[in-house]
Amino acid sequence: MLQYLFGGDRMYEFFKEQLDSKVKNHNLRTLREYCPIDAVRVKRDDKEYLMMASNNYLGLTFEPRVIDGALKGTKQYGTGSGGSRLVSGTFPLFTELEKELAKFKNTEKALVFNTGYMANVGTISAIADKNTIIFSDALNHASIIDGCRLSRGTVKTYSHCDIDELKYLLKQVDRNTRKLIVTDGVFSMDGDIAPLDKLYELSRDYNALLMVDDAHATGTIGNGHGTAAYFGLEKEVDIQLGTLSKSLGSVGGYVAANSTIIDYLVNTSRSFIFSTALSPADIGAALAALHVLETDASVLARLQENVNYMADQLISMGIDATNETPIFPILIGRNEDTLAVSDYLYEAGIIGTAIRPPTVPIGESRIRLTVTAAHNKEQIDYVCQSLQNAMKQL
């Protein structure tokens, strides 16, 4: 039946040719199974590995207080939500989490989505339409790019963090045209921080909405509240988006904004309206993790101490590591060389994933290393020494 629907063997041959091309270009992706031991160690084929590739920045996935939050949510409300938020899936836990997120982000309201990807896609496609011009950073996350496409608005992509180019593009547009400037707060593959203060000035000068995706900024930079807080712009940024799945150790996404925007999304965002709500365990874990972040300063302090320590070690090796975030891109270049470094680290008991196109531009393949609050200095030393040894093999 499938062969009939897709044009018989010829269509399957097309798929096979595409996969063969990826193999030839050292760009084939496969799934690799890991069994977590704790926040930084995993097991595979009876061998233990040090995880240096996850976004579990605060190490909260094994935090007893967060696990307890998930268990309490399940015991009180069951294993699943059973419906979409607008039908039957809005439990008291959701309301509590959204109030806490709004308070955390210093906004009037917040709205929880099932993933950060769905939050970006659902928000951008709702607030922008064919009459909107969207100004998007060249290195924005794929979910922002897809949201822009779904909106059917005109997209103007500016070079990465290039304020002068963005200003030039804004000047070409009538002031009364609907405009949206959207950026990652911390860029997921480079680890640098968007110049949000300058973006805000342009949004004000050219009458544009400003949206920031804080997926990798929440729980990592400044006081942990995200990029807007880092720049002192919590009240000025129109839309703050984030995830529950990275620093907060659960799963899900959210949007924080004023009441008008949130109420509008409830009524227009398709990825919100037509999705079954997250499970009570997910929401309970996120609530508990948010409480840990807000009340236990030692967790964020440990992360930032480890970030500084790892940056110092990499700089001593001649690697540029001047950012303030837990993301350390080790630029290699060619796919095959990047895979070779990743394989060397793997043999040394370290998970350091090779990031290749289309996730990053052609010729900019890299090892993306991340450090968390749960790593210790001995582990960081071992990773840096192993990386140095791996680079010598190229």
Question: Model-found features: residue ranges?
Answer:
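Active-site PLP attachment segment
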Residues: A229-Y264
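N-terminal "arm"/small-domain region of PLP-dependent enzymes with the aminotransferase-like
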Residues: L2-E17, K24-Y77, A208
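Conserved PLP-anchoring active-site segment centered on the Schiff-base-forming lysine
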Residues: T123-A142
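Active-site phosphate-binding strand-loop segment of PLP-dependent enzymes
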Residues: K156, H160-V212
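Conserved N-terminal alpha-helix of the aminotransferase class I/II PLP-enzyme fold
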Residues: D68, K72-T115
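Amphipathic alpha-helix from the class-I
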Residues: A281-A301, I315-M317
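Conserved PLP-binding catalytic core of the aspartate aminotransferase-like
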Residues: A301-N308, I315-G349, E364, A373
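PLP-dependent enzyme catalytic core of the Aspartate aminotransferase-like
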Residues: Y4, G8, P64, D68, ...
